[in-house]
């Protein structure tokens, strides 16, 4: 999913 990408960059 897309949220995985932002989650990795966010943390």
Swiss-Prot record:
- Gene Ontology cellular-component annotations: ribonucleoprotein complex; ribosome
Q: Does the keyword Ribonucleoprotein apply?
A: yes
Q: Which domain of life is it from?
A: Eukaryota
This protein's record includes keyword Ribonucleoprotein: yes
Instruction: Explain the purpose of this protein.
Output: Has antibacterial activity against Gram-positive bacteria.
Q: Which family does it belong to?
A: Belongs to the eukaryotic ribosomal protein eS30 family.
Q: What is this protein called?
A: Small ribosomal subunit protein eS30
Organism field: Oncorhynchus mykiss
Q: Which gene encodes it?
A: fau
């Amino acid at each position: 999913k897309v949220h995985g990408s932002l989650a990795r960059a966010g943390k």
